[in-house]
From Swiss-Prot:
Family: Belongs to the influenza viruses matrix protein M2 family.
Sites annotated Seems to be involved in pH gating: W41
Transmembrane segments: 23-43
Name the record gives this protein: Matrix protein 2
Lineage, highest ranks first: Viruses, Riboviria, Orthornavirae, Negarnaviricota, Polyploviricotina
Amino acid sequence: MSLLTEVETHTRNEWECRCSDSSDPLVVAANIIGILHLILWILDRLFFKCIYRRLKYGLKRGPATAGVPESMREEYRQEQQSAVDVDDGHFVNIELE
């Protein structure tokens, strides 16, 4: 038994949908969601370089510093740098054979 036999059956002219009630609000909502999903997927594939480049580089700028005194900016930079610095005594040596 084919999966298509439950929803569609082949007629002499073309494929015909044998739905009991295609005006059901749930069916209409599912169709709208499906169409929107397809549109968003197409836009994502067309503009993925722009979108992901914006996310990758645009959000890494850090918090806005307008109106923040220079001393606080420098303190923030030092905190960020100290969080990145690695203690040389805690390296793990992994040898690959």
